A protein has these predicted regions:
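Start-of-domain marker
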Residues: 20-85, 96-98
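Second-shell loop/turn segments in exported
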Residues: 31-38, 124-132, 247
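Bacterial Sec-dependent N-terminal signal peptides
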Residues: 1-21
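Flexible, glycine-rich surface segments
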Residues: 157-251
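Acidic/His-rich structured neighborhood in mature extracellular/periplasmic domains
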Residues: 82-195
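A cross-kingdom marker for long, charged
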Residues: 27, 213-301
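Sec-exported extracytoplasmic/periplasmic mature domains
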Residues: 49-57, 147-151, 267, 271
């Protein structure tokens, strides 16, 4: 487990250094784009991977085996005059204590991953300074990945990284960019975008959810390697927090992103539970996430 650290010392300006935090595999799918220079996508993929994996985003020490494993799939929908309109899926995970299992932390889809890029453009990040929308989005997601990872190891441990995301949102809202690039940063644009997610995560109203997120991982999953029954019971005990948050704000984005990452895992955990656990968990999940009924039905199979 990573050592506890003081929040005031967590962040630093991203710089090229050793002990980087992220190990991200990037895939770019340009199948929908015909008759274009396909080499540009290979160059872009390499540049994004180097940007995410070579920059040091915090002042914490990460051993090689502690790097956060993640993947990014970018599907190019439109490309013209160095403007790319894409959909991006980001997944991150972390190991569960005492097992070979890795648990998903993020399974996030950004449907407005839009940016301007010319082949061989250098991707540089300067904190609190807007350079390009691409570098801003990538930095936002690096901090989002680290924030979720830290929240899973320490109560509210991701706060400074979510605050870094918020700073990027604020910077981008006032930056000059193409209208298609603005999508995702603006409060009125959608209740399911980059702005909405980080606004939820830093909202005092969702502190109970973030405490549950920690307990789910450290006191639930990590406990299950030694005592499956106790770990599962601890997760079941905390799940009503999701229902409470959903009922207070049905349009809450963060609860949806949690279930996007955890729905299958919850099924795997509770289909081996007691009859009481199965019923309570199934009823709760169907109450807040009925669109995934087919998935949750497997709890009772």
């Amino acid at each position: 487990m990573r050592k506890l650290f003081y929040i005031a010392c967590m962040l630093c300006v991203a710089s090229i250094a050793s002990a980087q935090e992220i190990n991200c595999t990037v895939t770019i799918n340009s199948d929908q784009i015909e008759g274009s220079n396909k080499q540009v996508y290979e160059t872009l993929k390499t540049s994004i991977q180097e940007y995410m994996n070579s920059n040091r985003w915090t002042n914490m020490s990460y051993a090689e085996q502690e790097k956060i494993e993640c993947s990014m799939l970018i599907v190019v929908k439109e490309a013209a005059d160095n403007m790319y309109k894409c959909e991006m899926t980001l997944q991150s995970r972390r190991p569960v204590w005492g097992t070979t299992y890795t648990t998903p932390l993020l399974n996030f889809v950004d449907r407005n991953f839009n940016f301007t890029y010319q082949e061989f453009d250098r991707l540089d990040w300067q904190q609190n300074t807007f350079t390009t929308n691409l570098t801003a989005m990538l930095a936002y997601y690096c901090y989002l990945i680290i924030g979720h990872d830290q929240d899973s190891f320490q109560r509210l441990g991701g706060t400074p990284f979510f605050q870094a995301c918020e700073e990027i949102v604020n910077t981008c809202q006032s930056a000059s960019m193409e209208s298609s690039e603005q999508k995702g940063w603006l409060a009125f644009d959608s209740n399911r975008n980059r702005y909405a997610l980080i606004n939820n995560l830093l909202d005092e109203a969702f502190k109970k959810y973030r405490n549950f997120y920690y307990e789910y991982h450290r006191l639930g999953l990590d406990e299950m390697s030694g005592n499956v029954t106790n770990g599962r019971a601890r997760i079941a005990q905390g799940l009503p927090v999701l229902k409470e948050a959903y009922r207070s704000r049905p349009a809450t984005y963060v609860i949806g992103t949690f279930l996007d990452a955890k729905a299958d895992e919850l099924v795997d955990i509770f289909h081996k539970g007691t009859d009481k656990e199965k019923k309570e968990v199934y009823d709760l999940l169907m109450d807040i996430d009925a669109t995934r009924q087919t998935t949750y039905d497997r709890i009772n199979n």
